A protein has these predicted regions:
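Ligand-binding pockets and gating/stacking loops
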Residues: 1-419
Length: 419
């Protein structure tokens, strides 16, 4: 094959040399109509939320209580029923969120992050490792499920370090995806009709086949096959475009982020995604600002779950919601709350036995030690740490059996939080 033939093939495929193909030929089996594992959505409440304003409420006995954890009263704390362990603070839209979803929630309180640093806490809660140099769980899951998936790991922020085990995709503009997926669309008009486009594709494929068959060198044949596979990425983006809902019907950015990830999963392109919402670093005017951030979070989660239910994916999507750390059990001089190492997180969706709470804190928001087998408070037990949560996550998805787990060990055994 001479240089002219190679350039002809490059033109036929629409790919420039020096670029990695979107999908290698070895990954075709990974592009099934349905990915075997549930879609994992990691939702990050950026800035450090206050669990006592949400899922681990601490009220004051009366208005004369000195140095209260919160301004609301103990008797204002809400619960869905006398038999439910789930309780929530009387702030913002907490009532609507918990009443709608308490039976699906697994809340984990009293998690000791051992840090007040934003980046360290975010890393620990999303990788299970306190020190630097470890990929997020979402990246490890994607590497196991299909590292060559075109949009395998979508990220909108939070801890999205991959350590090179899998690419990550930031979807900054869905308009670009639509233009690549539907290059013949010009507004509402077709530049080429479907029959014309189909005939062009047929001639292009026939010509590509002739050029490929004329090449005998195995290395160049493999390169041509990769180019052909890269060109097929346009069809996969078209699938995503077809599965995307009208994003204008979502009232929150978080809801839109979740809808895009769900569309990617339904298209067989996405295994995991980072979603994010901010506003939780409330060093001043804590009650008002924390309530506003929690409203944004809970509204977005309700939109995401509505999308999950719309597609019948209740047992195919697992959502984990966490933050950087918690906030102090007292107000500062600016009526705000500062950083605190004890926090909470929760799960919703596939494989979660709901209406449950694991872990606890005392009235000073200090983590209580647990028996790691029964998960009940035990003075002789251990404090719950993010590494315990991630050991359970790895076991839940089978990541603990993947070689990456040996390369990035957690040095702790799994605990039965999903059992």
């Amino acid at each position: 094959m001479n240089r002219r033939d190679v350039l002809k093939i490059a033109g036929l495929t629409g790919i420039s040399f020096g670029l990695q193909p979107m999908i290698g030929s070895s990954s075709r089996a990974a592009l099934a109509d349905e990915i075997e594992t549930p879609l994992f959505l990691s939702v990050h409440a950026g800035g450090g939320w206050d669990p006592t304003s949400f899922c681990d409420p601490k009220g004051r006995a009366d208005e004369t209580s000195p140095d209260p954890v919160n301004h609301y009263m103990i008797d204002q704390i809400r619960t869905p029923s006398a038999s439910s362990p789930i309780r929530w603070a009387p702030m913002g839209q907490n009532e609507a969120f918990f009443q709608a979803h308490y039976d699906k929630l697994l809340i984990v309180n009293g998690v000791d992050t051992s840090t007040n640093n934003h980046s360290t806490g975010t890393r620990y809660l999303n990788s299970g490792q306190l020190e630097e140099g470890h990929p997020s769980f979402a990246a490890m899951l994607t590497a196991m499920v299909g590292p060559q998936l075109p949009l395998g790991y979508i990220t909108n922020g939070g801890y999205d370090i991959t350590r090179g085990i899998v690419p990550r995709t930031r979807l900054g503009s869905l308009g670009v995806i639509s233009r690549v997926a539907e290059p013949d669309l010009d507004g509402d008009r077709l530049f080429n009709s479907d029959p014309v486009t189909a005939r062009m594709d047929m001639y292009r494929a026939e010509r590509f086949g002739r050029l490929k068959d004329a090449q005998q060198l195995p290395k160049l044949q493999r390169g041509l096959l990769d180019l052909e596979a890269s060109r097929s990425g346009q069809n996969e983006l078209k699938r995503l475009n077809e599965n995307l809902p009208d994003l204008n019907r979502f009232n929150t950015s978080l809801g839109q982020q979740g809808a895009i990830a769900i569309a990617g999963y339904r298209s067989g392109l996405t295994a995991a995604a980072n979603l994010s919402v901010g506003g939780f670093d409330t060093h001043g005017d804590h009650d008002n600002r924390q309530a506003a951030a929690l409203n944004n979070l809970s509204s977005g989660l309700m939109e995401i779950w509505s999308e999950v239910e719309r597609h019948g994916l209740e047992d195919r999507v697992l959502i984990m919601v966490n933050s950087d750390f918690g906030r102090t059990p007292r107000y500062n001089e600016g009526n705000g709350k500062d950083h605190w190492s004890i926090t909470s997180l929760f799960f919703l969706g596939a494989g979660v036995r709901g209406n449950r709470v694991i872990g606890a804190t005392d009235e000073g928001v200090n983590a209580l030690p647990l028996n790691m087998q029964t998960l009940e408070p035990d003075p002789q037990g251990q404090k719950l740490q993010p590494t315990h949560i991630h050991a359970a996550l790895r076991a839940r998805f089978g990541v603990d059996q993947h070689p990456l787990s040996a390369h990035y060990p957690l040095l702790t055994e799994s605990i039965p939080i999903f059992g």
